[in-house]
Amino acid sequence: LASLHARGARRFRFVDRTFNLKAATGRAILEFFLERIAAAPDEPLFAHFELVPDHLPDALKEAIVRFPPGALQFEIGIQTWNPEVQARISRRQDDARAEVNLRWLREHTHAHLHVDLIAGLPGEDLASFGAGFDRLVALRPHEIQVGILKRLRGAPIARHARAFAMRFAERAPYEVLETSTMSADEIVRVARFARYWDLVGNSGRFPRTLPTLLGPAPFARFMAFSDWLWARTGATHRLAAETIAEALRAWRVEVDGAPEAEAAAAIAADYADSGARGHPAFMARGLAGGDRAAPTRQVRHVTGTMHPRR
């Protein structure tokens, strides 16, 4: 680490998923970065770690709280909150402890939290997956990565393929196409949901608009928006920021029934703060008035709030 830092490296990504299981080792690594930050506080530095969600010793907490905004990111794998599915895939996870740790990280540190859920696991249906998404939204991580299960060579998930009628794509990345509990159409809808969520939720561009879009039932409401956006555009890629902003305005006004001036003002403020180029049509109609190491998206989440406190 010292050699890489001395040669100019300022972005570090650790892919060891057991980083936080050995507190002494993890603490030493964190202290290494804290020392460099203290020595040159104006010199940008960014460190990314994978974190086991239900294990966060005090020794690590004491170091984590000392990191400034934009310097630390944790990738945290939840995959599923369904205890039966967890047992089936041999995933031992104390969900209550994981929730406590995620809430603590969100409320007491500047760490950027990137948390994942996986759709298509054996025995999990759309309702269960949606409940898991809602549970995660309530914990307010900066990003929720919605992924589709992939078949990896030699992975034990294969032993459940027959029992749950799991059908996978024949080409990489070998994503699941359907299971006995999640239809092919539902898998496709979740895949579109994931793409649109990345553009709207994970992008950090719409902190004022997102809470009104999600309301009291985040998964159901965003899935409805996702289905509507697909019917409107027929696209999941090459959607410019102004296209998304205009779609959000149309949804809020035409579907949700929100006052146009109110919806447009929030979306326009979000859009302007995000630094996106271009001007959505509703803004043109007049309906609404330096160096860093952290990636742009993380900076938006630090300076804004993806999921404001309720």
What kind of region is each of these model predictions?
Residues 1-122:
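Conserved SAM/AdoMet-binding glycine-rich loop
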Residues 98-101, 132, 190:
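Hydrophobic side chains in well-ordered alpha-helices
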Residues 30-32, 132, 161-165:
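Short, hinge-like loop/turn segments at secondary-structure boundaries
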Residues 20-24, 78, 83-89, 119-127, ...:
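Flexible glycine/acidic-rich beta-alpha junction loops that bind and position SAM and/or redox cofactors
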Residues 59-64, 122-140:
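Catalytic cores of alpha/beta
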Residues 5, 37, 41, 64, ...:
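Generic secondary-structure transition motif, activating predominantly at the C-termini of alpha-helices
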Residues 192-310:
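Radical SAM enzyme core and accessory elements
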